[in-house]
Structure formats: structure tokens, C-alpha cells
Amino acid sequence: MSIKSDRWIRKMAEEHGMIEPFEAGQVRFNDAGERLVSYGTSSYGYDVRCAPEFKVFTNVHSVIVDPKNFDEKSFIDIIGDECIIPPNSFALARTMEYFRIPRDVLTICLGKSTYARCGIIVNVTPLEPEWEGHVTLEFSNTTNLPARIYAGEGVAQMLFFQSDADDVCETSYKDRGGKYQGQRGVTLPRT
């Protein structure tokens, strides 16, 4: 398996719809010239943006967090250009980008250092071969202060690893009917 470069990422996005919408270069400023947390194609990855829809965890209803029987009342929905995450809490969001991962590719997501250096950690499981959808992002605020997340700006980087031609997986995410296949919007746990 080898990591793929900006040339490969551009080709796969432009010719095969791997990432939509797609930004061929790095965007660091908005139209008004104000600095952004960068997004778009980098040397060996793609920096994704957060969409303006969030689910912020709340304990108002005092429900038990159970991944097999998750209660939607555990979240407050927020739509907007930013989201405030309470201290020592978390929020779910999604990428603006929709992904279509090829059968011979595994994609790993890492949080951007701009957020990590503020105590905001991004967690995403790998995007498996032939998975497609919006990526659900989990932001953990590890600080004892409120933390701000910006929609429309970079939040995480996707790294693409392509298998050797003789070592493509036998069973893809699509083949096994993965429960998050084709997800749109912020997706809560499923069993």
C-alpha cells in the first residue's frame, strides 16, 4: 500500500467523482481576504470542510449513552456558521464533501493541528474500500472552556492509501452492505 499524492487526488476527484465538491488547491482566505483554517488539496492529502449542521451533546435529559440504543435526545441540533462545544463535551458534524472511495483505496482521517493545538480533537473511523457518503465527524472538546468550530473551513485531513494491484480486498464495504453506506447529513450510531 502506498500513500497517494496531490496529482492522484486531483485525477480521482475530477475524473471519477471521488470527492464532491472538490477544491484542486489549498484555500487559505475567504472572498473578503480573511484568513481561514485551510481546506482543499495538499501534498499528500485532502483537507475537508465542516458543513453548517451540528449535533451538540447535552445531558439535559439525563439519558444513558448506549451505542446499541442511542437516544437522539442526547443532542441539540444547531445550524450555523459556527458551533460552540461545551467544556469536556463533544459534537457531531459532517463534511461538506461527499466521498466515493475506490475498491483499492483505504482512507484515513486525521484532525488538523490548528484544532488539536486548542484541545479540540477530531475523530473519524477509516473510510473503507467502496464506501461512499458524507463523513460524520466527532469533535471532542478536551478543555474546561467552551470551544468553537467553524463551518465552511478545514477541520481534518484525509490520507489516501492505494493497495497493490495484486492485493485488492476480497470484500469491500459496499459488498458487505455496510450500515453507513450512502449516508447523508450527520449520522447517529446504528447497530
From Swiss-Prot:
SUPFAM superfamilies noted in UniProt: dUTPase-like
Keywords from the UniProt entry: Hydrolase, Nucleotide metabolism, Nucleotide-binding
Active-site residue list: 138
Keyword Nucleus part of the UniProt annotation: no
Gene Ontology molecular function terms on file: dCTP deaminase activity; nucleotide binding
Enzyme class: hydrolase
Pfam family, one: DCD
The protein's Enzyme Commission number: 3.5.4.13
Reaction it catalyzes: dCTP + H2O + H(+) = dUTP + NH4(+)
NCBIfam families for this protein: dCTP_deam (TIGR02274)
HAMAP family found in the cross-reference section: dCTP_deaminase (MF_00146)
Subunit architecture: Homotrimer.
Family: Belongs to the dCTP deaminase family.
Amino acids binding dCTP: 112-117, 136-138, 157, 173, 183
Function: Catalyzes the deamination of dCTP to dUTP.
Pathway assignment: Pyrimidine metabolism; dUMP biosynthesis; dUMP from dCTP (dUTP route): step 1/2
Coiled coil: none
Cited Gene3D superfamilies: 2.70.40.10
GO BP of this protein: dUMP biosynthetic process; dUTP biosynthetic process; nucleobase-containing small molecule interconversion
Name under which the protein is recorded: dCTP deaminase
InterPro entries: dCTP_deaminase, dUTPase-like_sf, dUTPase_trimeric
